């Protein structure tokens, strides 16, 4: 009986739990405040991440990245930091509705997608991730649409504790940080351009 308990303890100690590491919402924005009342629309479409895994090295079977809640919650956090007054709507408003509601602008975030690739080159696992979002800033008479993307990569020797899930979390988090910085810059500049 002692050996059975000892064996179970050893087995459970060796099992990895990949569910603990996940992409986190961005909260630490440095953003200038934008005056006026704005409407923010965040599409409820699911974030589409296409994984192209061509190698079984680095425990690639365990790769499981979820960007849907982190990116949408990051946009909400950005809006809190960026706008003195704003509303989040469940649908896009028409230019006439924007004007009638006295919104300075409507900012729509949609087209959430990403592609990740993993392959082995010689003895190195190579992972690349690209995240994309479409940002449309409009008022009753003008609109500006920007397709924003962020790319990051990660490499590790396949013989030295190579774990794709950990590498994917690391590079995915950096890609999301970079994407949100670009989203802020694009949104701020577009609002300035349509309201001047």
Residue ranges and their predicted role:
Residues 16-20, 91-149, 156-160:
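Surface-exposed short loop/turn segments
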Residues 3-12:
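Sec-dependent N-terminal signal peptides
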Residues 52-58, 117-120, 160-164:
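Short acidic, glycine/proline-rich loop/turn micro-motifs
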Residues 14-31, 138-196:
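C-terminal/domain-edge helix-coil "capping" segments
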Residues 64, 68, 72, 126, ...:
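Solvent-exposed, acidic/flexible segments
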Residues 82-92:
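Short secondary-structure junctions
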Residues 72, 76-80, 84, 184, ...:
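Generic solvent-exposed, charged/amphipathic alpha-helical segments
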Residues 13-78, 192-196:
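A structural "domain/chain start" motif
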């Amino acid at each position: 009986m002692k050996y059975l308990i000892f064996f179970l303890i050893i087995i459970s100690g060796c099992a990895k739990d990949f569910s603990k590491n996940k992409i986190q919402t961005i909260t630490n924005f440095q953003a200038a405040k934008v005056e006026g009342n704005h409407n923010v629309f965040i599409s409820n479409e699911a974030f589409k991440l296409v994984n192209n895994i061509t190698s079984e090295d680095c425990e690639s079977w365990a790769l499981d990245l979820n960007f849907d809640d982190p990116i949408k919650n990051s946009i909400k956090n950005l809006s809190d930091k960026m706008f003195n007054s704003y509303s989040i709507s469940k649908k896009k408003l028409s230019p006439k509705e924007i004007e009638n509601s006295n919104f300075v602008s409507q900012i729509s975030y949609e087209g959430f997608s990403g592609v990740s690739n993993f392959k082995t080159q010689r003895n190195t696992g190579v992972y690349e991730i690209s995240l994309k979002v479409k940002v449309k800033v409009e008022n009753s008479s003008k609109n500006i649409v920007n397709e924003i993307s962020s790319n990051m990569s990660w490499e590790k020797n396949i013989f030295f504790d190579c774990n794709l899930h950990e590498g994917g979390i690391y590079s995915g988090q950096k890609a999301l940080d970079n994407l949100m910085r670009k989203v802020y810059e694009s949104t701020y500049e577009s609002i300035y351009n349509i309201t001047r």
